[in-house]
Swiss-Prot record:
It comes from Camassia leichtlinii. PROSITE patterns: RUBISCO_LARGE. The modification N6,N6,N6-trimethyllysine is found at K5. This is Ribulose bisphosphate carboxylase large chain. The keyword DNA damage does not apply. The modification N6-carboxylysine is found at K192. RuBisCO catalyzes two reactions: the carboxylation of D-ribulose 1,5-bisphosphate, the primary event in carbon dioxide fixation, as well as the oxidative fragmentation of the pentose substrate in the photorespiration process. Both reactions occur simultaneously and in competition at the same active site. Keywords: Calvin cycle, Carbon dioxide fixation, Chloroplast, Disulfide bond, Lyase, Magnesium, Metal-binding, Methylation, Monooxygenase, Oxidoreductase, Photorespiration, Photosynthesis, Plastid. Binds 1 Mg(2+) ion per subunit. Substrate binds at N114, T164, K168, R286, H318, S370.
Length: 447
């Protein structure tokens, strides 16, 4: 007599369990599934659960040596997507023990590592993840978080202002440092290395770090405010990255930066640990995110990447603008902005939030609005993002006809005007342009 029947078997027999009650410790995922024609949604959903946990395409005799009931992912609910034919949201619950503690890398390898090339699916998108406290507590999270950052910078009650130094490639270190100084001197809080500035022949990283540090100290001395420049520590190896972070710390600068998707979560988590241990703030740029999150029916939504970053660690992360040159729908953006900053976020499907997320006491991340924004967007940005944000104007500062410093002045004046107007109870959405025009009377740079 044979122990079990060989051959291909339906996943839904084992992995589709509509009556499963999810546990508080389960990691829950919401997938947008587009099955191939002829594949029933239950089978597609079960296939996702199986291939991203314990399953394979047939029964193997070693299945008898483990408890599938304890370790299998389960597709516990399927709903049709309104307005799309043949698209479904499949909800999958993963037992906590499938994941290594404190490793975003392993979490993604398990949940999205294998299943996206699956034949029975035409397309697959991970829309949201519910991270249980039992798992999130195994992560350090952001090196410092919003409150500690405000205390370090001594800046309260307003958004922070930044600017990416352009042209992003081709400046010498000395001219680069000069641009940094002018922007900070004019009134910005931060300037930023572009994400592609690492250590190229025209400007090696050490030279850039030195000139930028000089610019920071000079601007601090002249303005009496704490200034920062996001020194991009991203490098070809983790060791080199940490070496750059150490050099930044020795120069006494407040903040470094990392491209977390191109650099990878393992490198990012290492850097975040270094930053907490050594009092550096960590700015995160999301270069490469659109490769993963741009397609509506395949890939991963950015809110998942944002949650992962909060666990891996970063104090700032780019989060779209809602108003500038890059796409991003307002409600969705606000949804993951809350996921980055708040402690407890209610499920809210209208904002794309599929699960109630409780971060317990993990520090928050400051969202950075950046990309094609300028002073006329300031009222909208102040209203949408609130105080705990960084507003970054690249061309919006350096494009000023009088130069960088006046561009910085214009931005700072506009910001202060908006914050003051808001605190006086005026409606930024309605009177935004009027507020900016009034401010122009006091500031020739803005006019």
């Amino acid at each position: 007599s044979v122990g079990f029947k060989a051959g291909v078997k339906d996943y839904r027999l084992t992995y589709y369990t509509p009556d499963y009650e999810t546990k508080d410790t389960d990691i829950l995922a919401a997938f947008r599934v587009t099955p191939q024609p002829g594949v029933p949604p239950e089978e597609a959903g079960a296939a996702v659960a199986a291939e991203s946990s314990t399953g394979t395409w047939t029964t193997v005799w070693t299945d008898g040596l483990t408890s599938l009931d304890r370790y299998k992912g389960r597709c516990y609910h399927i709903e049709a997507v309104v307005g799309e034919e043949n698209q479904f949201i499949a909800y999958v619950a993963y037992p906590l023990d499938l994941f290594e503690e404190g490793s975003v890398t392993n979490m993604f390898t398990s949940i999205v590592g294998n299943v996206f090339g699956f034949k029975a699916l035409r397309a697959l998108r991970l829309e949201d993840l519910r991270i249980p406290p039992a798992y999130s507590k195994t992560f350090q999270g952001p090196p410092h978080g919003i409150q500690v950052e405000r205390d370090k910078l001594n800046k309260y009650g307003r958004p922070l202002l930044g600017c990416t130094i352009k042209p992003k490639l081709g400046l010498s270190a000395k001219n680069y440092g000069r641009a940094v100084y002018e922007c900070l001197r004019g009134g910005l809080d931060f300037t930023k290395d572009d994400e592609n500035v690492n250590s190229q022949p025209f400007m090696r990283w050490r030279d850039r770090f030195l000139f930028c540090a000089e610019a920071i100290y000079k601007a601090q001395a002249e303005t009496g405010e704490i200034k920062g420049h996001y020194l991009n520590a991203t490098a070809g190896t983790c060791e080199e990255m940490i070496k750059r972070a150490i050099f930044a710390r020795e120069l006494g600068v407040p903040i470094v930066m990392h491209d977390y998707l191109t650099g990878g979560f393992t490198a990012n988590t290492s850097l975040a640990h270094y930053c907490r241990d050594n009092g550096l703030l960590l700015h995160i740029h999301r270069a490469m995110h659109a490769v993963i999150d741009r397609q509506k029916n395949h890939g991963m939504h950015f809110r998942v990447l944002a949650k992962a970053l909060r666990m891996s660690g970063g104090d700032h992360i780019h989060a779209g603008t809602v108003v500038g040159k890059l796409e991003g729908e307002r409600e969705m953006t606000l949804g993951f902005v809350d996921l980055l900053r708040d402690d407890f976020i209610e499920k809210d499907r209208s904002r794309g939030i599929f699960f109630t997320q409780d971060w317990v006491s993990m520090p928050g991340v400051i969202p950075v609005a950046s990309g094609g924004i300028h002073v006329w967007h300031m009222p909208a940005l102040t209203e949408i993002f609130g105080d705990d944000s960084v507003l970054q104007f690249g061309g919006g500062t350096l494009g000023h006809p009088w130069g960088n410093a006046p561009g910085a002045v214009a931005n700072r004046v506009a910001l202060e005007a908006c914050v003051q107007a808001r605190n006086e109870g005026r409606d930024l959405a309605q009177e935004g342009n009027e507020i900016i025009r009034e401010a122009c009377k006091w500031s020739p740079e803005l006019a």
